[in-house]
Structures are given as structure tokens and as C-alpha cells.
């Protein structure tokens, strides 16, 4: 293979340029030309296929900066319709005209789903990225746990019930994804900063973090030492939450709560999806979980509690919300993300050169080897209907009574943040939380 294309698709993450850099470095070593396709899958719909030569004469172009967030190539949320064979044939012809023999797609579970029809026509592989850390499997047979419902009504949806209450962390397929560690650093720093406002004004802060339906970002926000963490994998127990908030507020005169944007109530309804809208990829927009939770606390706790303490005139005055927002997705990636993103970009090049197709580079972890790159056939991620689902945080990672990471969850996080840049994360904070549990 002499010429490869690479594109970045889906939401931006801090480590995308590092992935591109890793692919360029490996392509240079193998004397393979690397063409960057501009604006993700969208480039494939353009007759010109906008592109840039990333390694002329097998040297990096200076614009590639692995320490810079975002993506030099641009991204989109467009995907290829697997049933549109005319468009797929046209895309294949366009890439052939550029003499591109294989394609690397940098993305998450949506991109892995989207590359399937391309892989049926020419070699295509995935280099992983997502701040949500929801690309992968908790254990190899996890796709078999999905069930499809609603066929009779026409409202088809998928549900899953974990078959294992415990599992070995070494079984995880794609232990962690580049972009996640940086997003955790930003979230934890936001929690720490908002704490001082809550302390100063005797208030209750609800901080919303990203992650969609997976609780990994909220879980690791424990590095910022919130009092309570709420994750989507465990439906909200409002009465328990109110009791816990009252207990903490009585003790220390302030409370900091981290709430995942995909949080659900006891009936399974998403708190942040009260207004139905979708993003360009068709995903339901989750925005407002923290506000919905604040309204519930205001109603349940009432004004008299705060007036009795003489700390606020009303519950509405005492309880406030903040979103960490898109700062989790942007900015300079920390060293852990830069290093392993580059390794995975290089692995994707190797996969194509070695003749693989419809495969994903992954970052694995074991007690004996630590972190190391590997790969899996993309079909390993698919359920019986051929669909790839976002990975949920395993319920065993969270203690629903204490409303914080469980010992298993802490064991999961430690390898990541022990190896992350010590200038960006404070590993000792997790030990403090463990001692308090």
C-alpha cells in the first residue's frame, strides 16, 4: 500500500491532531503517502474530495501540532447511507482517482458504524477518539446482551441488561480512548473551582458534565472532590439524594454535586431531554439535566430549610447550576492523551499496510504489560443486528448508596491517571475519596 487517506469525524476532542501526527510518523517510516481528507465524511460527498498531502517527500508538514486541540483536518457529523449504493460507488471511484488505497477514520462508535459500508468497497480502519470514553466493550460478549424492542409498534429501540456483576478489567476491549483523560482534567478543575464559590456563599452547586449516556466523565470528576456524583447507569433516587444533600449541607454548609448530562430519573426518563431536539448526526441533544435536577431539589427541600440556617432566603437562591460544557472537548491535550493518540494513529497505518479491513485500533491494559496498542475486528463490537452501541460505564464502577465511585471504579481509573501527566492530575485525590468511603 503506497497511499492512504485519513479523516476525522464526529465531535472534536483534544487529541485528534496527535492521532494525525502518529499516523504521519508511521507512514513516513513505512514510506507511505498520507492524504488528509478535509471535513470528515463530508469530504467524500464533494467531487473534488478536498484533501491535503500530510507528508510530502515523507516529511511532516509544519501545520500538524499534536499539542493543539481540535483537528487540523476539520470534522463533520455526516455519515454514509449504507443503502445508497450509487453514492458509495461514487465515493469509491473518487478515492481511486486519487490513488488512495486505504482509509483511516478517526472517530467514536458512530464513526465505527459509519465506516462499515465503506469497508465493503475498500480497506477502511478506525483510530479511536471520544471524550465520553464510550467506544469499546466492558467484556468480549457484551454485544450479546442487547435486545431489540418495539418492532410491533414501529418504534424500535434497544435495551441492555448487564449479564455480569463483576469482571476482570483486563477483559475490557479498548480500555480508554484518547481525549477522555484531558476532558476529566478539565471537569475536575471546574469542580474544584466551583467548590470555592459554594463554600463562600453557603450554596449547593450542581455541575453538569458531558458523556451522553455513559457515566465515565462524571465518575472521574471525583478527582475534583465533589460531595456527590450522579451517573446515567444508576437512575436517580431522589429521596436518597435529598437526604444526602441535607446531611452534607448541615455538616459543612455547602454541597457540590456532579451530574452527568445523560442522567435519568427512576422511571428511566432523561432529565436533560425535556425539549426534544437532535444534533446533525441525529442524536438526541441532552441539555438541561442540571437544571431539571435543581428544580427537583428546590421542590423537595423547600425554602424553610435554608431560612432556618439563615444562609439563603429560598431554596432557589441557595441552589445553582453550572455546565463545564465544550471546554471539556477543546484545548491542549495532556501528555497521556497525546502519547497514546499518536500510538493509535500509527497502529491504524499498520493495520492497513498489513492488509486488515473493517478493524479498529484499540488501547488495552493489563497488570503485566500496562497500556499497549492492539486491534479488533469491528464486527466484535456489533450486536446480532449489526449495530454498534456506545459503551455504558459498568454499574459495578459506582456505589449508588454513597453516590460516588466504588472501589472497582477507582481501580479502573487509577491506571489511567497514574500514567497521566502529573502536572495535570492529582492522583492523591482519588485516595482521599476512597478513604472517605
Q: Can you annotate each of these PLM segments?
A:
Residues 1-49:
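N-terminal phosphate-binding or glycine-rich loops at protein starts, especially the Walker A/P-loop
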Residues 46-103, 131, 143-171, 176-192:
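Glycine-rich oxoanion-binding loops at beta->alpha junctions
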Amino acid at each position: 500500500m503506497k497511499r492512504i487517506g485519513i479523516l476525522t469525524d464526529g465531535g472534536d476532542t483534544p487529541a485528534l491532531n496527535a492521532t494525525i501526527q502518529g499516523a504521519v510518523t508511521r507512514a513516513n517510516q513505512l514510506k507511505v503517502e498520507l492524504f488528509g481528507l478535509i471535513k470528515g465524511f463530508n469530504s467524500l460527498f464533494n467531487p473534488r474530495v478536498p484533501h491535503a498531502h500530510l507528508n510530502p517527500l515523507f516529511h511532516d508538514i509544519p501545520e500538524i501540532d499534536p499539542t493543539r486541540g481540535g483537528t487540523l483536518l476539520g470534522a463533520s457529523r455526516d455519515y454514509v447511507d449504507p443503502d445508497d449504493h450509487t453514492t458509495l460507488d461514487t465515493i469509491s471511484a473518487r478515492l481511486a482517482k486519487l490513488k488512495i488505497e486505504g482509509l483511516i477514520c478517526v472517530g467514536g462508535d458512530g464513526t465505527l458504524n459509519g465506516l462499515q459500508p465503506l469497508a465493503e468497497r475498500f480497506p477502511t480502519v478506525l483510530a479511536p477518539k471520544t471524550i465520553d470514553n464510550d467506544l469499546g466493550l466492558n467484556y468480549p460478549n457484551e454485544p450479546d446482551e442487547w435486545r431489540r424492542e418495539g418492532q410491533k409498534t414501529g418504534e424500535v429501540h434497544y435495551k441492555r441488561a448487564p449479564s455480569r456483576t463483576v469482571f476482570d478489567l483486563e477483559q475490557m476491549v479498548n480500555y480508554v480512548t484518547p481525549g477522555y483523560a484531558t476532558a476529566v482534567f478539565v471537569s475536575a478543575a471546574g469542580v474544584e473551582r466551583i467548590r470555592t464559590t459554594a463554600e463562600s456563599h453557603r450554596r449547593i452547586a450542581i455541575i453538569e458534565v458531558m458523556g451522553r449516556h455513559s457515566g465515565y466523565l462524571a465518575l472521574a470528576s471525583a478527582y475534583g472532590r465533589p460531595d456527590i456524583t450522579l451517573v446515567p447507569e444508576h437512575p436517580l433516587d431522589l429521596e436518597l439524594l435529598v437526604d444526602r444533600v441535607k446531611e452534607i449541607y448541615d455538616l459543612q454548609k455547602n454541597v457540590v454535586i456532579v451530574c452527568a448530562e445523560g442522567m435519568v430519573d427512576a422511571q428511566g426518563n432523561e432529565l436533560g431531554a425535556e425539549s426534544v431536539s437532535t444534533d446533525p448526526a441525529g442524536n438526541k441533544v441532552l441539555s438541561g439535566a442540571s437544571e431539571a435536577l435543581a428544580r427537583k431539589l428546590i421542590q423537595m427541600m423547600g425554602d424553610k430549610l435554608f431560612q432556618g440556617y439563615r444562609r439563603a432566603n429560598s431554596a432557589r437562591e441557595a441552589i445553582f447550576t453550572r455546565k463545564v460544557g465544550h471546554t471539556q472537548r477543546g484545548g491542549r491535550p495532556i501528555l497521556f492523551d497525546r502519547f497514546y493518540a499518536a500510538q493509535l494513529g500509527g497502529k491504524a497505518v499498520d493495520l492497513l499496510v498489513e492488509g486488515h479491513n473493517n478493524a479498529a485500533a484499540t488501547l488495552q491494559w493489563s497488570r503485566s504489560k500496562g497500556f499497549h496498542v492492539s486491534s479488533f475486528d469491528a464486527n466484535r463490537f456489533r450486536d446480532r443486528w449489526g449495530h454498534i452501541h456506545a459503551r455504558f460505564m459498568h454499574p459495578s464502577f459506582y456505589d449508588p448508596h454513597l453516590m460516588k465511585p466504588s472501589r472497582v471504579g477507582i481501580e479502573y481509573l487509577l491506571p489511567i491517571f497514574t500514567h497521566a501527566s502529573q502536572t495535570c492530575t492529582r492522583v492523591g485525590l482519588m485516595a482521599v475519596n476512597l478513604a472517605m468511603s
